[in-house]
UniProtKB/Swiss-Prot annotation:
<feature type="transmembrane region" description="Helical">
    <location>
        <begin position="138"/>
        <end position="158"/>
    </location>
</feature>
<feature type="transmembrane region" description="Helical">
    <location>
        <begin position="93"/>
        <end position="113"/>
    </location>
</feature>
<feature type="transmembrane region" description="Helical">
    <location>
        <begin position="164"/>
        <end position="184"/>
    </location>
</feature>
<feature type="transmembrane region" description="Helical">
    <location>
        <begin position="67"/>
        <end position="87"/>
    </location>
</feature>
<keyword id="KW-0812">Transmembrane</keyword>
<dbReference type="GO" id="GO:0005886">
    <property type="term" value="C:plasma membrane"/>
</dbReference>
<dbReference type="Pfam" id="PF04279">
    <property type="entry name" value="IspA"/>
</dbReference>
<protein>
    <recommendedName>
        <fullName>Inner membrane-spanning protein YciB</fullName>
    </recommendedName>
</protein>
<keyword id="KW-1133">Transmembrane helix</keyword>
<feature type="transmembrane region" description="Helical">
    <location>
        <begin position="5"/>
        <end position="25"/>
    </location>
</feature>
<feature type="transmembrane region" description="Helical">
    <location>
        <begin position="36"/>
        <end position="56"/>
    </location>
</feature>
<dbReference type="InterPro" id="IPR006008">
    <property type="entry name" value="YciB"/>
</dbReference>
<comment type="similarity">
    <text>Belongs to the YciB family.</text>
</comment>
<comment type="function">
    <text>Plays a role in cell envelope biogenesis, maintenance of cell envelope integrity and membrane homeostasis.</text>
</comment>
<keyword id="KW-1003">Cell membrane</keyword>
<keyword id="KW-0472">Membrane</keyword>
<keyword id="KW-0997">Cell inner membrane</keyword>
């Protein structure tokens, strides 16, 4: 599989474990948190399969973001299963989004003044340093919002948590991405247009 094809399907592969989780969550009957424990087992297995496949397809490497997802899924999924308590798996998504927000916020300090978003999108868009910094803060805000939403659904609106985790955050992300690329279309590098 060539790199362009792999880059195109990566976002879809990322959702497979969540879809497996949601399916098992909705189709398993049980008392208390039994359905969440079963869904967490499915999530762990699907995560290891999907990211194992990505590891092979990406020439035996994973991106930092992918490692973060795998490690946090294994840690929080493992704690959920070990203690038979869904509290731990509900922590995963808010923590992942908070780490992304924090990482982008701190990126100029560790990348010689270059915002992390510029490192990721620089090959596609041409902007001034000030514009890159603003865009970086927009993404920090987005990941902060996602962390807050995930925490609210995980601990306040618990009955909707699985639905939001599987589909709601995907909808928020797609709307954000469409808005971003609509705004950024004027900054696309001329050699890409």
């Amino acid at each position: 599989m060539n790199a362009k094809t792999l880059d195109a399907i990566k976002p879809f592969l990322d959702w497979i474990p969540l879809i497996v989780f949601f399916y098992i969550y909705k189709t398993t009957e049980g008392e208390g948190s039994e359905h969440i424990i079963a869904a967490t087992t499915g999530l762990l297995i699907a995560t290891l399969i999907v990211y194992g496949l990505m590891f092979v397809l990406q020439k035996f490497t994973l991106e930092k973001r992918q490692w973060l997802v795998v490690v946090l899924t294994v840690v929080f999924g493992g704690l959920t299963m070990a203690f038979q308590d869904d509290f731990y798996i509900r922590l995963k998504a808010p923590i992942i989004n908070a780490v992304f927000a924090f990482g982008l916020a701190m990126s100029p300090l560790f990348l010689g003044g270059t915002p992390g978003i510029q490192k990721m999108l620089g090959p596609i868009f041409e902007m001034t340093p000030k514009q890159w910094m603003k865009l970086n803060w927009v993404w920090v805000g987005f990941f902060t919002l996602m962390a807050v939403l995930q925490a609210l659904f995980a601990f306040v609106w618990v009955e909707y948590w699985a639905m939001f985790t599987a589909f709601g955050d995907m909808i928020v992300m797609v709307v954000f991405m469409v808005a971003q690329f609509w705004f950024l279309r004027g900054f696309m590098r001329k050699d890409i247009k």
